[in-house]
Each structure stands twice: as C-alpha cells, then as structure tokens.
Amino acid sequence: MRVLFAAAECAPMVKVGGMGDVVGSLPPALKALGHDVRLIMPGYGKLWSRLEIPAEPIWRGQTMGTEFAVFETRHPTNGLTIYLVGHPVFDPERIYGGEDEDWRFTFFASAAAEFAWNVWKPNVLHCHDWHTGMIPVWMHQDPEISTVYTIHNLKYQGPWRWKLDRMTWCPWYMQGDHTMAAALLYADGVNAVSPTYSREIRTSEYSEKLDGLLNYISGKLRGILNGIDLEAWNPATDRALPATFSADDLSGRARNKQVLQERMGLEVRPDAYLLGMVSRLVDQKGVDLLLQVADRLLAYTDTQIVVLGTGDRGLESGLWQMASRHPGRVSVFLTYDDDLSRLIYAGSDAFLMPSRFEPCGISQLLAMRYGCVPVVRKVGGLVDTVPPHDPAQQSGTGFCFDRFDPVDFFTALVRSWEAFRHQDSWRELQRRGMRQDYSWARSAMEYDQMYREVCGLKEPGPDAAAVEQFSQGQDADPSLAQGQHAAPTSPPEQSSEDLSKGPGSRNPLAKLFGGQRR
C-alpha cells in the first residue's frame, strides 16, 4: 500500500515535540510490513545544510496563487524518501511562530494535496496535527485517496475559520471552527497517540472544547500508542554515553551519574538521589509543580535535580532562581542538547513527568529504556506506559500520582526517594523498565489495520491449503504445520485501480457494476 505522510516535523532533522519522533521512526516499521511509505514536509532553510538535496526540483506546482517547487531527498538514517516543499516562506530558521504561521502551514497543506493528486498518488494520506488539517477536507473529493489524521496534541488547533475563508476556496461549512475541527470531520480515520488520551479528549476536562465533536466522531476515533526506536536509543551501544550498560549489567550507570554530576556542576555523590527532567518548559509539563515542591524536597532529603529544556520565560526564571538557592544541588540548562539529554536519561536515578495532560509522551519511554525510573502523573499516555510500582508484588515500572496537586506530587517523590534507599529492589525496578517492549513494530501493526479499514480492504487470511489442512485436523494451528512459526507475510501492495474495483471499494458504483468500469 502506498502511504504518504504529511507533517511539519521529522526527527532528527526537525524536532520540536513528540510528532517529530513519530514521523521519523514509524515509517521504517510500516515499511517492514510491506508498505511504500514516503513523507512530504516543508523545506525549512536549515534542511539544506543537513540533507543532500539536488539543485533541481522534481516538480513545480501552484496553489493559493503562489508557485512552489518540490525537491526529493532521503532521511539521513533510515533512507525514507522525503519530499520538501520549497518556497521562500519556509527559509527562516524558525519552525513555528510568527504572524504568517497560519498562512505558511495552510499553504504547505495545499501544496501537499496538489503533489498527491499530480505526482505521487497514495492509497492513504496520513496527516499529522493541525498543520495538515485541511488536507482531509480537500481529499474528501477523491474516492481513490483515503485520509488518516493523527492528533498529537489537541491543544494546538490551528487557524480559525475567519482566517481560512481568506486563504482557501473551501466554503465555511467545510471548515469547522478551525483546521483541527475540519480534519476531525472529514478524515476517514482519526487516532490519538495513546488509548487513554483518546478517551480523555472526549471529556470536557481534556477536550479543549471539542468534546461534542469528538464524541460525534467516536466511531472512527481510536488510540494507538507511540513507540521508540530501540536501535537509536540503546544504552548498550550509545556512543554519547561515557559508559554503556544493559539490563543485565547496570554497572555503567554509576559512571554516567558521576559524569552528569560533574558536567552539571553538582556535588559528586554516588549516594545522592538524582532527579532528571528533559522537557519543553510549558504549563502542560507541570514545571510549576516542581517549583512548588522543590525547596521542601531538598530540605528534607539528599535529592539533586537537573533540568534541560527551553520554553516559557516565567518558568525559566523560576528554575534559575531555584538553582541559585541550591548551588551544587540544582542545575538548569536552558537549551536542548541531544547528547546531554541521553546523559540525563543514563545518569539520573529517576525522571520527572508531572504533566497536566500528556497525549502519549516519549520521554518516559526513553527514561525507562535507560534505567531511569519515571515519576509521573496518571494521565494520558503515562497511564498506558508506566504501571505503578508495587513492591509487594514486585511489579510496575514507576511511581504515579493522581491529582495535579503539589501534595500528591511531593508524596510520590518521597515514596520514590524511600524506594531508592533499598538498592536491590531499586535495581530490579530499573531492569523491569528497561525490558519493556515499546518498539514501533507493535504500533505499526495497529496503523496497518487502520489503513486497511479506511481503504475498505480485508485482513489477509491463510491460503486455501492451510485452511483445508486445519479443517481436516492435521494441525491445531496452520501456521505451525511444519513445526515452526511461519513468518508473517506482508500484505501485497494495492494499486489505486485495485482499490477502486475491489469488493471493499469506497466507490458505491463498484458494487452496482460488479467492479467493471463502464
């Protein structure tokens, strides 16, 4: 099946939030299932120095009264084919923000739609967040292209209808209130990035005033949990670490902790309880909770805290003041550094995610992968990925609290600090987290099923010989006929012509004429 991703980010070249990780890591897992997956994204100015891009475009087009060019290149690590929409409006170094943000991404969405119609026509056009929200509206006219829309963060909803009226030809009744609403209405399939978040956004508390619409489309809404690239994030082979380690041998973490303390200007103490946080510094991430409890926690325990990230100026100022009150015990780096983030995951004892809401979260998965025990709030994808630690049952991978409240958060931190005093059980807790399977292979199977549903394709079944053998009782499981597990076969690629003529076609005339074109 031909699948075209349309997104504003792709890790590692352009990454602001979790969407970049998804767009950069999911396509290889889908390719392993037999899909031909490609990506179209804005041609930001910074990409020309980070990728090998030919001087000549593969296609020139026009939309919204403006000409653009499309350049073809490859992902630097996984070889994914990437199409870049080239136009001077994407030249600045910034990704988001600016007075022209709404126009820029509406223009990109329109260019992506034109490319899909005229150059590389996919069976499924997979759109990510509000930047591509108008694509399902335009593609609704084309019965040969199905659309899937992924909600990465419902809080960011795109330009409102009065702006869209001036930028697109779509009448007002096709747009909803904003691009997010338009995508939810017209996409053939919609998914959130975790099962719990897909349920939460149908309630008034987390819906950002879209609960009515989300309940209306609940029949096509599902939650598919994000994953991580286990090869790119592997503590046993990570070259950014001073010492590698694995679940079977955790000795290297002590060296990483020492280097982290030295680099961040903390007292070098192997017995100190070191808390790490790598995050955008915004209200969503619960940084204000940390500011409320940090002084008391530092007064009564031997805790150290390291924070890496950028964001809201008020929160940055609060963190700086906290660091100045506790020299040698609190360190704050207001930047983003990939190597330093890996060192924080590999050297910290616990990882903080006290989020107000969390669609899925990638950081807690990376933390567990590197043996860093997460302390999280029970919300969104954190519920699906961090089962609470139960010392009596020797189960769970982290510490959880319910209410977005400093008392609850402080209690969870004290519980984790007390557990850290018992090193034998703490190491078992670390190992359980490191052995969790949050690879993209599991998520890719669910996306594959979703693609088949929106295209009207049936699930692949066993061949006739296997069914006959099973019916005669020769083997209890046809896949074990030779005494071995048969490797799953990838689905055959379906052309657009096959889709229009197949029994599951979205074209109602196919049933009337028996799949024959008249």
UniProtKB/Swiss-Prot annotation:
* This protein's record includes keyword Glycosyltransferase: yes
**UniProt entry keywords in alphabetical sequence:** Glycogen biosynthesis, Glycosyltransferase, Transferase
Reaction catalysed by this enzyme? [(1->4)-alpha-D-glucosyl](n) + ADP-alpha-D-glucose = [(1->4)-alpha-D-glucosyl](n+1) + ADP + H(+)
Q: Which domain of life is it from?
A: Bacteria
Give GO MF terms, alphabetically.
alpha-1,4-glucan glucosyltransferase (ADP-glucose donor) activity; alpha-1,4-glucan glucosyltransferase (UDP-glucose donor) activity
Query: Which EC number(s) does the record attach to this protein?
Result: 2.4.1.21
**In which pathway is this protein known to take part?**
Glycan biosynthesis; glycogen biosynthesis
Give the binding site residues for ADP-alpha-D-glucose: K15
Entry-linked InterPro entries = Glyco_trans_1, GS/SS, Starch_synth_cat_dom
- Say yes or no: keyword Glycosyltransferase present: yes
Q: Which family does it belong to?
A: Belongs to the glycosyltransferase 1 family. Bacterial/plant glycogen synthase subfamily.
Functional note: Synthesizes alpha-1,4-glucan chains using ADP-glucose.
Q: What is the name listed in the Swiss-Prot or TrEMBL entry for this protein?
A: Glycogen synthase
Question: What is the primary gene name for this protein?
Answer: glgA
